[in-house]
Amino acid sequence: MNNKSKGRTAEKIARIFLLSKGYQIIFQNYRFSRLGEIDLICCFDNILIFVEVKSRSSLLWGQPEEAVGYEKQGQLKKLANIFLYEFNEFTEYQIRFDVIAILNNNKVKCEISHLRDAF
């Protein structure tokens, strides 16, 4: 399985996880030009949440959430501003940035961590 399909699988796991917690998925893979993409955008209790999904198959390179550094955070904030400009019906919502970290080291069951208000 290549990295792109691993990422899509992780996003699917994250989407199912969030739906099971009562979140409403608004967009998946919101992309603007070459600036990048936001994995998931969802709503929960009048909060608009921009979600970055990271996964690892081992801890050799660290925890999955450690891959969301300052540069990636800045990129996500820019994309969120563009999204809010494009879809102004969400301007009254509170905004939050979450990270879903998935560790799947070839076990039947993966470990999912939901870091709310991660940055």
From Swiss-Prot:
Coiled coil: none annotated. One of its GO terms (molecular function) is nucleic acid binding. SUPFAM superfamilies: Restriction endonuclease-like (SSF52980). InterPro entries: Restrct_endonuc-II-like, tRNA_endonuc-like_dom_sf, UPF0102_YraN-like. Pfam families: UPF0102 (PF02021). Belongs to the UPF0102 family. NCBIfam families: PRK12497.1-3 (NF009150), YraN family protein (TIGR00252). This is UPF0102 protein Nther_1376. It comes from Natranaerobius thermophilus (strain ATCC BAA-1301 / DSM 18059 / JW/NM-WN-LF).
